[in-house]
């Protein structure tokens, strides 16, 4: 199960009734934060999402409405008692920006691992943290994160998250591979085990892969020909909808954003299950007034709202 909360749905500037766009995902008690504009940690308190268990922070681009909340959040996480490493993923230039923020944060009780302009990452989800791993034929990860270069006025990344479902234990396979019963439970947890100088791996006892959960996120971009393939068959596609009406197309083109209808067209082409719009212009008072524009193209389109929660379950 993946729990997804929209911490904010605004673009450009924080408004009294709308925080800046940010999303937090919770999987097995560990969290991933997508973007961190001014006021994000306030919304986290309002929604009770917690700070200490944030392992990965994904930044789409370096405009203030997506990153100005980061210094304060990093400080708060430090005050929460966290000592485990945090990964910050972002576009080209993210390291320089974080280094600047750290001038105001001379001491953090945890390490920051800044991953700049990367395209494909794999993580294991452990009880106390998520951990970056290198895959081989013997070990499978719990989570893959892929990025895509978008079309905005500054370097910008889209994100696609694949949550892998744990494979079922296969007793016949374990016996065939002569795996001692005392290590079965650890191998089922995808751990590597040594016993009597012999190494055992999870592939020796686990069955075939099962369908997981895919969530994709693109914000602050014009439509590109690569997006539909990148988001293909996502269970949930979170996309910017800065402008509700096609009458604002000239603004969308000039400012390198999207209209509701353009986002819906990407969702349709990508054959996603559900589209959730976010990053609304301050000029939009009620995004739901414009949702018909998206549904004309892709029926399962929804205008997100601050604090909205979506639960994505594994399917058999």
UniProtKB/Swiss-Prot annotation:
Residues noted as binding Zn(2+) 1 in the record, renumbered to the chain: 61, 63, 152, 220
Instruction: Tell whether Nucleotide-binding is among the UniProt keywords.
Output: no
Q: Which domain of life is it from?
A: Bacteria
- Give the matching Pfam families: Lactamase_B, Lactamase_B_2
List ligand-binding residues for Zn(2+) 2. Answer: 65-66, 220, 279
Cofactor(s) essential for the protein: Zn(2+)
Q: Where is the active site?
A: 65 (proton acceptor)
What's the EC number here? 3.1.26.11
Q: Which UniProt keywords apply?
A: Endonuclease, Hydrolase, Metal-binding, Nuclease, tRNA processing, Zinc
The cross-references to CDD domains, in alphabetical order and at most eight, read: RNaseZ_ZiPD-like_MBL-fold
Q: List the disulfide bonds.
A: none
Q: Name one GO molecular function term.
A: zinc ion binding
For this chain's record, the cofactor binding note is: Binds 2 Zn(2+) ions.
Catalysis performed (reactions): Endonucleolytic cleavage of RNA, removing extra 3' nucleotides from tRNA precursor, generating 3' termini of tRNAs. A 3'-hydroxy group is left at the tRNA terminus and a 5'-phosphoryl group is left at the trailer molecule
Q: What does this protein do?
A: Zinc phosphodiesterase, which displays some tRNA 3'-processing endonuclease activity. Probably involved in tRNA maturation, by removing a 3'-trailer from precursor tRNA.
Spell out the subunit comment.
Homodimer.
- Which family, according to the similarity comment? Belongs to the RNase Z family.
This protein is called: Ribonuclease Z
Query: To which species is this protein native?
Result: Clostridium perfringens (strain SM101 / Type A)
């Amino acid at each position: 199960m993946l729990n997804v909360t929209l911490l904010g749905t605004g673009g450009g500037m924080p408004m009294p009734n709308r925080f800046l766009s940010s999303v937090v995902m919770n999987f097995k008690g560990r969290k991933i934060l997508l973007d961190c504009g001014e006021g994000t940690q306030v919304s986290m308190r309002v929604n009770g999402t917690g700070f200490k268990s944030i392992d990965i922070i994904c930044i789409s681009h370096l405009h203030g409405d997506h990153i100005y909340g980061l210094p304060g959040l990093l400080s708060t996480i430090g005050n929460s008692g966290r000592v485990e490493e945090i990964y910050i993923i972002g576009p080209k230039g993210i390291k320089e920006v974080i280094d600047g923020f750290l001038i105001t944060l001379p001491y953090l009780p945890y390490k920051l691992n800044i991953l700049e302009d990367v395209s494909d990452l794999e993580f294991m989800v452990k009880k106390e943290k998520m951990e970056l791993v290198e895959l081989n034929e013997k070990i499978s990860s719990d989570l893959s994160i892929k990025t895509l270069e978008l079309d905005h006025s500054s370097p910008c990344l889209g994100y696609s998250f694949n949550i892998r479902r744990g494979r079922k234990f296969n007793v016949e396979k374990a016996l065939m591979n002569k795996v001692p019963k005392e290590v079965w439970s650890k191998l089922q947890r995808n751990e590597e085990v040594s016993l009597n100088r012999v190494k055992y791996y999870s592939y020796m006892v686990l069955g075939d892969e099962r369908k997981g959960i895919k969530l994709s996120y693109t914000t602050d971009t014009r439509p590109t020909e690569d997006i539909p393939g990148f988001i293909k068959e996502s269970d949930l596609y979170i996309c910017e909808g800065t402008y509700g009406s096609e009458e604002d197309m000239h603004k969308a083109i000039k400012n390198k954003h999207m209209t509701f209808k353009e986002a819906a067209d990407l969702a349709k082409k990508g054959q996603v299950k559900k589209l959730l719009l976010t990053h609304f212009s301050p000029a939009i008072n009620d995004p739901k007034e414009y949702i018909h524009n998206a549904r004309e193209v892709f029926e399962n389109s929804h205008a997100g709202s601050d604090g909205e929660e979506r639960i994505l379950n594994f399917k058999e």
